[in-house]
């Protein structure tokens, strides 16, 4: 804001994914109604011990400052807040070195509460095989399910809140239509972000992600960590000084790895999760 003449953008390439863009459109158009619940199971990040041993900096508090949340999940944490907004309260359960000989988290379950009373769960690990990538967002009018490259919408005949208050049968749920949602099929990824960045400079066109939005996903990651370290829920925005204090405690006792770094085959790592 101090330099409005400059362009500041984030490389959030997953926002260009046609499925996530369509979900964003449907949610923000009101098509699913008021948010009730969001669940993301993103556990198809499988990593072996060899992966973690391949660099002295990997999976250390001093080298990376975190594990699966900071290394594998930044784009998913950005996407979930881009789609439905930041929660107001977070409870995190980070298991450090649960499945690998590492000092940082490799298994996480986080619980979210949103300002309107909606709730969410975010589950991730680098130890599940074959793993799952399923994002489900439920509103009062419809549920969106993103899995296996498809977007399914289960559209209710009536807003659930209205149905609940007016239906005269105790066990009858509202009927719904299952729709496989069409997208434009475009998945521009990094080139699309760079093209938008250039277009913003040249013609003032919208960025894929304004740089000021970059803090949101990190705030969510830090909140999950801090809550887990403290053993109780935290509210957002978090106490940044307290977070840094707790992180520095872990950095101070971080283990120094020995041995040479090795190169690994990263083919298939950068997919369209």
What kind of feature is each model-predicted range?
Residues 4-9, 14-102, 231:
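Predominantly a Rossmann-like dinucleotide-binding segment in NAD(P)-dependent oxidoreductases
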Residues 19-20, 76-77, 190, 194-195, ...:
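A general structural signal for well-ordered alpha-helical segments in protein cores
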Residues 69-73, 208-214:
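Conserved loop-to-helix N-cap of the C-terminal "lid" that shapes the substrate pocket in Rossmann-like
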Residues 74, 99, 123-131:
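Glycine-rich phosphate/pyrophosphate-binding beta-alpha loops
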Residues 105, 110-116, 137-139:
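Active-site beta-strand termini and strand-to-loop segments that position acidic
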Residues 114, 140-212, 234, 243-273:
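C-terminal glycine/acidic-rich active-site capping loop/insertion
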Residues 220-230:
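Short arginine-rich
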């Amino acid at each position: 804001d101090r330099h409005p003449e400059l362009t500041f953008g984030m490389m959030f390439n997953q926002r260009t994914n046609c499925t996530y863009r369509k979900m964003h459109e449907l949610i923000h158009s009101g098509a699913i109604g008021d948010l009730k619940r969001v669940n993301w199971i993103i556990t198809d990040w499988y990593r072996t011990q060899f992966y973690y041993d391949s660099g002295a900096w990997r999976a250390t508090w001093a080298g990376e400052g975190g594990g699966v949340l900071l290394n594998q999940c930044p784009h998913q944490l950005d996407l979930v807040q881009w789609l439905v907004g930041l929660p107001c309260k977070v409870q995190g359960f980070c298991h450090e070195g649960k499945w690998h000989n590492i000092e940082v988290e490799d298994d996480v379950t986080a619980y979210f509460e949103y300002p309107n009373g909606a709730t969410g769960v975010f589950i991730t690990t680098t130890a599940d095989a074959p793993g799952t990538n399923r994002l489900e967002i439920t509103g009062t009018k419809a549920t969106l399910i993103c899995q296996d490259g498809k977007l399914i919408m289960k559209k209710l005949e009536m807003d659930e809140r209205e149905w609940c208050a007016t239906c005269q049968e105790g066990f009858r749920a509202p009927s719904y239509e299952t729709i496989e949602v069409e997208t434009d099929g475009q998945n521009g990824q990094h080139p699309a972000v760079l093209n938008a960045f250039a277009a913003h400079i040249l013609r003032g066109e919208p960025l894929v992600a304004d740089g000021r939005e970059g803090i949101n996903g990190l705030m969510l990651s830090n909140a999950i960590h801090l809550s887990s370290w403290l053993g109780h829920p935290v509210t957002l925005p978090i106490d940044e000084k307290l977070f840094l204090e707790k992180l520095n405690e872990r950095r101070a006792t971080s283990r120094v790895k020995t041995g040479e770094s090795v190169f690994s085959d990263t083919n298939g790592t950068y997919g369209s999760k």
